[in-house]
Amino acid sequence: MPHDAPPFSHPFRVAALPARKPSRFDLRPGPDTSAAIAADLGLIGLDGLRFRGELRPAGRQDWVLEADLEATVTQACVVTFAPVTTRIAEPVVRRYVAGLAEPEAEEVEMPDETVEPLPEVIDAGAVMMEALTLALPPYPRAAEADFAGAAAAPEGAAPLTDEETTRPFAGLADLLKKGDGAS
């Protein structure tokens, strides 16, 4: 569901940053903002979200954002839809390089995924949201979840078993024996 504005933003205007010392930050969104972030990411719950680090100069024009992301997320189990709680603790590094050309093709493979072109404004809140999104378990599963498998088949036919699906040519010999011998 697209939004006009992200649920959390903490911008740093690059031109206003001190050129010789790091700018430290400690972002802890409040309950309302955390609820908005959880809704934006499709989470059941989000607690203890914290993004702490610094934005420091690297050379004459480049910048490095280095931070630690901490959060406790609650997602729905992919099997039972029961709540699954996961603790996230991830280091985050982004390097902003002046003069880095934006790739023009629709899909481009970047050699280093932490390198980005230097924008006029570095949004630590957007970096936090991106890092949280990437750190989420893609298929959360409750400890007691048991996936017995799907048993789907056309009407009047028996569903395939695991043995039948792992041995696709198992019935080939029987079919050849039933044949009339003509080739």
Task: Label the predicted regions.
Residues V64, D68-A105:
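Helix-adjacent hinge/juxtasegments
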